[in-house]
C-alpha cells in the first residue's frame, strides 16, 4: 500500500521507545495483556523463516470480489498458491472485508475455511487482515467495477472507510464481525497471525483512525485467540498511532518500500523492542525495494518477508502508485507482482534468488 517512510526515524525513537510502567500508566482495558518479549520470542523460536506475498487472486479486483459467494474462486486460488509453493513461499497475507461477512456470515467463514484448506495443502500459512485505510473509501456489495486501464489498485476498497464516520453506530457491527471471525478460527493452526488494521491513518485519516484501532485490539484481547495480534507501523509521522500499535502488538509488524539502507535503519529501530519482526509489505522495484536488495537482509535477521503481489491481474499493481499508463501496456519495470496469469514470470533472475533463499527445489 502507498505510504511514506521518512529517512530519519527520530519520531519513532522519541515517541515509541519500549514502554516503561509508571505510576501514571493507565491500566489497559484488554481481557489479556500484550505478549511480553519472552512470550513473543517463545512463540517464534520454533517457527521457520517465512517468505511470502500479499495475496488476492488475480481474478479479483478487491477484497469483496475475493470473498463474495458469486466471485469466490477456489480454482484460481489453488493454481496461484501452487505457483507460490513452487518457489518456496510459505506465508500469505490476505485481506478480508466486513461487508462480505455482513451479507452471509456463515458462508463467509466457510469460504475462509476453504481458502485455508487450499493454502494448507500447499504448505502455506495465512495472516488475515481485518481493516484497511487504503484506496477507495466507499464500496458496495455485488458486482465490482472493472479495473481502470493502467491504474494501480483502482478498485481496492477501504474497510470500513468513510462508513464509520458517516454512521458511527456501525462500530457495533464491526465488533460483531471481528469477534465472530476470531472466535471461529481462534485455535486454527493454519493461521499464523491476525493483522488487525492495515495502515491506520492512511488516506488522510491520521489520528481519526485511533478509535477503531483501539477498539479492534480490545475486541481481539477479549476473544483471546491462540494466534498473536498485531497492526503494522508504516509512517513514522503518525506518532500517536505508532505508539499505540507498537505497545499493543504481540509481535512487531511493519511496512517498508524504501531502499536497503533505509530499510536497515527501520529494522535497527524496531529491534529495540526485542520482539520478532515481520515485514508485511515491501518490494516496489522502481523505488529500489527489490527482492535482491531486501530479501537476503530479512532472511539474515529472521524477519518474515512478505512482498506486495503474487500474480498480476485485476489489481493492476504492476503499475506504480502515481504513474498510470493510459495505454495499458505493460511497464518495462513492474512495480509489484511476480507471476503472470499464465504462470510465466516477470523475472527469472528474481525467481532463482527467491528459490535459493527459500531452499525450494
Locations of the language-model features?
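Bacterial signal peptide processing site
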Residues: 17-19
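C-terminal motif of bacterial Sec signal peptides marking the signal peptidase cleavage site
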Residues: 12-15
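Structured C-terminal subdomain patch of bacterial secreted/periplasmic proteins
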Residues: 323-324
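Catalytic domains of carbohydrate-active enzymes that cleave complex glycans
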Residues: 356-361
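Active-site mouth of glycoside hydrolases
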Residues: 28-249, 255, 260-262, 273, ...
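Sec-dependent signal peptide recognition
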Residues: 1-9
Amino acid at each position: 500500500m502507498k505510504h511514506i517512510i521518512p529517512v530519519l526515524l527520530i519520531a519513532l525513537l522519541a515517541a515509541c521507545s519500549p514502554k516503561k510502567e509508571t505510576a501514571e500508566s493507565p491500566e489497559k482495558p484488554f481481557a489479556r495483556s500484550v505478549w511480553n518479549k519472552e512470550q513473543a520470542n517463545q512463540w517464534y523460536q520454533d517457527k521457520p523463516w517465512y517468505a511470502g506475498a500479499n495475496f488476492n487472486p488475480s481474478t479479483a479486483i478487491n477484497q469483496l470480489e475475493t470473498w463474495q459467494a458469486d466471485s469466490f474462486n477456489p480454482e484460481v486460488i489453488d493454481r496461484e498458491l501452487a505457483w507460490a509453493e513452487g518457489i518456496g513461499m510459505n506465508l500469505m497475507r490476505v485481506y478480508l472485508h466486513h461487508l462480505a461477512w455482513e451479507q452471509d456470515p456463515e458462508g463467509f467463514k466457510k469460504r475462509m475455511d476453504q481458502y485455508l484448506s487450499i493454502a494448507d495443502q500447499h504448505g502455506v500459512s495465512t495472516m488475515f487482515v481485518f481493516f484497511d485505510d487504503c484506496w477507495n473509501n466507499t464500496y458496495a456489495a455485488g458486482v465490482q467495477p472493472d479495473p481502470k486501464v493502467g491504474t494501480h489498485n483502482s478498485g481496492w476498497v477501504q474497510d470500513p472507510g468513510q462508513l464509520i464516520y458517516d454512521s458511527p453506530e456501525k462500530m457495533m457491527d464491526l465488533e460483531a464481525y471481528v469477534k465472530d471471525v476470531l472466535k471461529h478460527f481462534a485455535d486454527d493452526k493454519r493461521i499464523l497471525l491476525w493483522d488487525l488494521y492495515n495502515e491506520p491513518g492512511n488516506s488522510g485519516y491520521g489520528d481519526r483512525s485511533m478509535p477503531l484501532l483501539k477498539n479492534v485490539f480490545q475486541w481481539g484481547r477479549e476473544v483471546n485467540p491462540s494466534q498473536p495480534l498485531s497492526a503494522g507501523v508504516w509512517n513514522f509521522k503518525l506518532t500517536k498511532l505508532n505508539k499505540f500499535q507498537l505497545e499493543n502488538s504481540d509481535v512487531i509488524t511493519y511496512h517498508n518500500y524504501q531502499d536497503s539502507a533505509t530499510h536497515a535503519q527501520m529494522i535497527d529501530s524496531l529491534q529495540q523492542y526485542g520482539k520478532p519482526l515481520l515485514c508485511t509489505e515491501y518490494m516496489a522495484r522502481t523505488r529500489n525495494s527489490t527482492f535482491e536488495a531486501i530479501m537476503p537482509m530479512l532472511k539474515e535477521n529472521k524477519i518474515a518477508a512478505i512482498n506486495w503481489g503474487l500474480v498480476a491481474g485485476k489489481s493492476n499493481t504492476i503499475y506504480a502508485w502515481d504513474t498510470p499508463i493510459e495505454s495499458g501496456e505493460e511497464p518495462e519495470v513492474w512495480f509489484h507482482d511476480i507471476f503472470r496469469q499464465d504462470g510465466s514470470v516477470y523475472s527469472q533472475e528474481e525467481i532463482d534468488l527467491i528459490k535459493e533463499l527459500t531452499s525450494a527445489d
